[in-house]
A protein has these predicted regions:
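Short amphipathic alpha-helical elements of helix-turn-helix/winged-helix folds
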Residues: 23-30, 96, 100, 160
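Hydrophobic alpha-helical connector segments
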Residues: 63, 74-103, 157
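Basic, helix-initiating cap at the start of DNA-binding domains
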Residues: 1-42, 59
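Short hydrophobic/aromatic patch on the recognition helix
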Residues: 44-54
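Helical hydrophobic small-molecule/effector-binding pocket
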Residues: 87-112, 121-133
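Hydrophobic/aromatic-rich alpha-helical bundle segments in the mid-to-C-terminal region
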Residues: 108-113, 121, 125, 140-185
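Amphipathic alpha-helical interaction segments
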Residues: 19, 38, 59, 88-96, ...
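Alpha-helical DNA-contacting segments of helix-turn-helix folds
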Residues: 58-68
């Protein structure tokens, strides 16, 4: 059995990590500079505490991106993606996670600015695996075209999602129109 002091330290450490990740998301959403000092101030912990858990701002961003992906995957896990074609399932997935995507736009922009492309891709690994599976299913059932590499199609989906959120946040498209515009564009790009 764990000692009470150890349990308390572990709980405190976990609360600190969550506070730092929340701070990262909040700062990114505001477009504020992501620095260790800013993360410490926003999270209410010291810079030493931030460094005790993360060795750099990119490591905080990677952890925050991983947590965001976990939220997306939790929503996806609650969805029934089995019926219909691969393209139908992909459209349902995009529609199901769409409400989360706007909340994560600042974090997405920050990871784009501060993480190397391979680190961004790794942070989104589970989402890409899910999308890759739906693309493969759609190619096999004939609902998704097979005249372009599947990896390219996954990158197109990723880029379109982030572009749609960015356009909404910059007033180029109404929020109410975002999901429908995204789904119809994905359908046009992918349909066999």
């Amino acid at each position: 059995m764990a000692e009470p002091a150890t349990d308390h330290r572990q709980a405190t450490a976990q609360r600190n990590v969550e506070a730092i990740l929340d701070a990262c998301e909040a700062l990114a959403a505001r477009g504020a500079a992501l620095t260790i000092a800013a993360l410490a101030a926003e999270s209410g912990v010291s810079r030493v505490t931030v460094y005790a858990h993360f060795d750099s701002v990119p490591s905080v961003l990677q952890a925050a991106a991983h947590r965001a992906v976990e939220r997306v995957m939790a929503v996806a896990a609650g969805m029934d993606l089995e019926p219909g074609s691969g393209l139908d399932a992909l459209e349902r997935l995009v529609g199901g996670v769409w409400p989360l995507l706007g909340e994560m736009d600042g974090l997405s922009r920050a990871t784009g600015d501060l993480l190397a492309p391979e680190a961004r891709r790794a942070a989104h690994g589970e989402v890409f695996d899910l999308i890759d599976g739906l693309i493969a299913r759609g190619r096999a059932d004939g609902s998704i075209r097979d005249d372009a590499p599947a990896a390219w199609q996954a990158s197109v989906i990723y880029a379109l999602i982030h572009t749609a959120v960015d356009d909404i946040n910059h007033g180029r498209i109404a929020a109410a129109d975002g999901e429908a515009a995204l789904v119809s564009t994905l359908r046009a790009a992918l349909r066999a």
